[in-house]
Design a protein with these regions (language model features):
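Electropositive polyanion-binding surfaces
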Residues: 2-440
């Protein structure tokens, strides 16, 4: 099961962590407090692990992705660290969060809260107008976030639908438009190389004060969520590429090529559905999968075919080999941007800091990492599966609760899957269930 309470030893250690940045911690760090910096998250997020700064000189964008320096407060093999590794990830259930770290850290000193000095690990990238990172620097920094934004406000400012937000955040508006511009460039560049975008609507379950599900609706990605996604992907790739090239022991996020047999049966199935795809070589490429997804857009059976394509894919996992990410069509990829809620990110922050401080070659650090990382990657992958499953089950329970208030009503939906025992129907609000063959 998923651990719910933190052991006393862990809580005691969390209590001892300072709630503000100490002068000694600032020593030797790059001071970026002068940069115009924002966080952009959901309205109710409390664990803010990433902040953004962006300027442009000539045709070069200077993008700063600033990530909370959690490893400054969670020491290797401390009680806090062992508990975090055991949990592997925070779990976001429909009615609560089961955090990887105690809230005193995750919502306090490790959260990039507005107007507070915070320690960060920053990936500073110079990006040209084609979306290529021409140079980058990873540095230990001190930052101070000017504004805690939420996705909705940024989206409304960019779509010009909220005068009040425009007035309130007037000083930041040029930066938001520049973000939108760079995000579009990065997205195009990823699309060009074959990155696959499955556009499945996620669910947003609305609960009342008593925790009962009162509404279920699709959670839509928008211009603001895409900006953050694009910038995080870029930082993750940039970090992974540097460490893979340097051949330093590391934890990567990898996604293997699909199983050839599954691909064959998928192509046959698609052929029968009237979707004709030729693959050039033995192994299918991300670009070819991308073309399948694009060729079915708007078709009545789009949802069903997208699911079939997704099922032919392997699951992404954490590994110590940098074997690439099929779905992103990326040669290098890692998880660097969420150390408050994912252990692999916290783990690689330690490696990066040891490297920046010149400690890897001394003190046997390289051997130490070579010894522990396979197990960290394995444990993190297992915890991620466990969390995904718990999140799915929790969503299903809340959706069932919501639908139980609508018994006897008629709903229109699309057939999202067919099996020997019936058909799966998905409603516009993302609720999906089986219509059993016996009831047809």
């Amino acid at each position: 099961g998923i651990p719910n309470e933190f052991p006393e030893k862990v809580m005691k250690q969390a209590q001892r962590v300072p709630d503000h940045v100490l002068d000694a911690d600032r020593d030797g760090r790059l001071d970026l407090r002068h940069l115009q910096t924002v966080t952009i998250d959901g309205e109710d997020a409390k664990d803010l692990d990433d902040a953004i700064s962006l300027t442009k000189e000539g045709d070069i964008y200077h993008l700063g992705v600033h990530i909370a320096d959690v490893s400054n407060y969670v020491q290797y093999n401390s009680a806090l660290d062992r508990e975090a590794l055991k949990r592997g990830t925070s779990v976001y259930l429909a009615d609560r969060v089961v955090p990887m770290l105690p809230e005193r850290l995750s919502n306090g000193i490790c959260s990039l809260n507005q107007g507070e000095d915070r320690l960060a690990l920053s990936c500073l990238m110079d990006i040209n107008e084609k979306g290529k990172v021409v140079s980058h620097q990873i540095a230990e920094t001190v930052i101070n976030v000017n504004e805690r934004m939420c996705y909705t406000d940024v989206k409304n400012i960019l779509e010009d639908t909220d005068e009040e937000a425009k007035k309130r955040y007037e000083a930041l508006i040029p930066m938001f438009f520049m973000m939108k511009e760079l995000s579009g460039i990065l997205r195009n560049s990823r699309h060009h190389r074959g990155s696959i975008d499955f556009d499945f609507p996620e669910s947003k379950i609305i609960l009342n004060a008593a925790g009962k599900a009162i509404d279920v609706k699709p959670y839509e990605a928008n211009v603001a969520t895409k900006i953050i996604e694009d910038f995080m992907l870029m930082a993750n790739e940039t970090v992974a590429q540097e460490y893979c090239t340097e051949e330093i022991p590391f934890v990567y996020r990898t996604h293997d090529n699909p199983d050839p047999e599954k691909v064959e049966s998928l192509l046959t199935l698609l052929h029968n559905q009237g979707v004709k795809i030729q693959k050039a070589k033995e192994e299918i490429t991300p670009k070819e999968i991308q073309q399948i997804i694009e060729s079915i857009e708007g078709l009545p059976n789009e949802a069903m075919i997208s699911r079939l394509v997704l099922r032919s894919m392997k699951q992404a996992k954490y590994t110590t080999e940098c074997s690439g990410h099929f779905g992103l069509a990326a040669k290098y990829y890692c998880h660097f941007t969420s150390p408050i809620r994912r252990y692999p990110d916290l783990q690689i922050h330690r490696i990066i800091k040891d490297n920046l401080r010149g400690r890897l070659m001394r003190e046997g650090r390289t051997e130490h990492y070579a010894e522990i990382l396979d197990e960290v990657a394995r444990q993190s992958s297992v915890c991620e599966r466990r969390a995904d499953e718990a999140e799915r089950e929790s969503d299903k329970l809340k959706k069932a609760e919501y639908m139980s208030y609508h018994l006897g009503e008629e709903f229109e939906g699309i057939i999202s899957g067919v099996t020997g025992w019936g058909l799966y129907v998905e409603l516009p609000n993302t609720v999906e269930d089986l219509v059993h063959v016996n009831t047809l």
